[in-house]
């Protein structure tokens, strides 16, 4: 994959990365590297892809930066929520960054992604910017959903990112509908429908998988298994936690979701399979560092030793840092400098997002129904709006 393609995934971050490469000894080589995944892929009724993943120095550095931006964004969102600048629900993604970044590296913007409510980092991976992300979190007009969606409803139409959905598992049938449209239009594209292990027992998921298999739709169902559905451990909710086998007659693949290169390899394989043969299930073995949401401290149903153990042994950013240092692509000091600049970039984005005003009260009635069908929201014709926003 060419460096020019790699450097367009998250535009603001990539521009910074390019400047860093030019100014320092950080490698800008596009010479291929072959790196083995952390663990083998485990497959169900399909031969797994090779563990040997082709990458480049530029791609590894981009992975490091993109995941670091996402991590810093989520940590900042935690602080903004505690300061009551973010209201309502807020679900953070720190720890799971490799899934968003690795998936994006394997596909194009013509492919579609739809996910649940833990959606901030997927939005960034699809090309969203920090200002619109923070503005949306704080309910501001400059947000990606005009401040009306909040944490759970990020959206980016021009990148085929269909959100952020708050109803557990309900995004999967919608994703299979997107895959139906792709096949109907004879496109060489696929849809990735993401859901968590807590949603894996939903009946609608199996209904959608059945029709996708029947019609051989290019649908990839991605279970982000972070091992806890809210506060419920997977073993307490699932008789069979081997989610990649849940499709029965549909092939499946279990992936180390903390290894960005493994995610990239699996998603590339899954897209090719889905376009040619129909649906496939990917189980991403990952982990969230925060609790389920901001009301969950995340330490009542798991030990602090468990969390710190994952951080020390499987953290996706640290894994890439080690690869960069092992291949002499940058020095430890240069990576630290990059992280300092990321903190400033995030702080600047927050300041800019705060300058955006709250939505006007008239926005209560916009974007509720599709235009052109003669349907309006009840009360939209009132001359004086009684509703007010704080």
UniProtKB/Swiss-Prot annotation:
The UniProt GO MF terms for this protein read:
metal ion binding; pyruvate dehydrogenase (acetyl-transferring) activity
Q: Where does Mg(2+) bind?
A: 197, 226, 228
Q: What is this protein called?
A: Pyruvate dehydrogenase E1 component subunit alpha-1, mitochondrial
- Transit peptide located at 1-15
Recite the lineage of the species.
Eukaryota, Viridiplantae, Streptophyta, Embryophyta, Tracheophyta
User: What cofactors does the UniProt entry give for this protein?
Assistant: thiamine diphosphate; Mg(2+)
Q: Sorted alphabetically, which InterPro entries does this protein's record hold?
A: DH_E1, PDH_E1_Alpha_Subunit, Pyrv_DH_E1_asu_subgrp-y, THDP-binding
**Superkingdom of the source?**
Eukaryota
- Which residues does the record give as thiamine diphosphate binding sites? 117-118, 166, 168, 197-199, 226, 292
Its function? The pyruvate dehydrogenase complex catalyzes the overall conversion of pyruvate to acetyl-CoA and CO(2). It contains multiple copies of three enzymatic components: pyruvate dehydrogenase (E1), dihydrolipoamide acetyltransferase (E2) and lipoamide dehydrogenase (E3).
What residues does pyruvate bind to?
A: 91, 117-118, 166, 168, 197-199, 226, 228
Give start-end positions of Basic and acidic residues composition bias: 302-312
Q: Which organism is it from?
A: Oryza sativa subsp. japonica
Q: Where in the cell is it found?
A: Mitochondrion matrix
Q: Where is this region: Disordered?
A: 293-312
Q: What is its EC number?
A: 1.2.4.1
